[in-house]
């Protein structure tokens, strides 16, 4: 409330900013966008892979100068795991999650999640605004528990056979 009085608006569970000044860097993570990072110990998420560059400066320089390996880790993230990350990270934002976006991106049904959201809405923990499920201020305070409920429900879902 104090921040709102001074023109700061909440855009993420632990972040407030004046209009036009949200942290674009962190929004990449919260919205699941791809990102590339460079230099020793840099982490990236690009083309379905998550990878980290070697933290040791000598190994990094040797790899760059001699066209050798510079990655210390590289993994392909399974689609269901990405769907879980979408739920967890998007629910941290005031924009929340959207059914069509979720279903199209991850080929998982939204209906089981919708049932959970509707129950939570009756407790004033979330609300549907223009087709997007968002946590309320009360919901933000209980976000970890809410996200666990949704992830448990998501794990039970069977993948769709085709895109909607």
How would you describe each model-predicted region?
Residues 1-108, 158-159, 163-164:
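C-terminal scaffold of the Radical SAM
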Residues 13, 113, 130-131:
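Residue-level detector of family-conserved "landmark" positions at structurally sensitive sites
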Residues 22-26, 123-124, 141:
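Short secondary-structure transition/capping segments
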Residues 58, 81-88, 114, 140, ...:
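Non-catalytic, well-ordered alpha-helical scaffold segments
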Residues 107-122:
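Short amphipathic alpha-helical interaction segments
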Residues 121-131:
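A short, conserved structural fragment
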Residues 132-136:
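Minor-groove-contacting beta-hairpin "wing" of winged helix-turn-helix DNA-binding domains
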Residues 138-164:
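Short, amphipathic alpha-helical interaction segments positioned at domain boundaries
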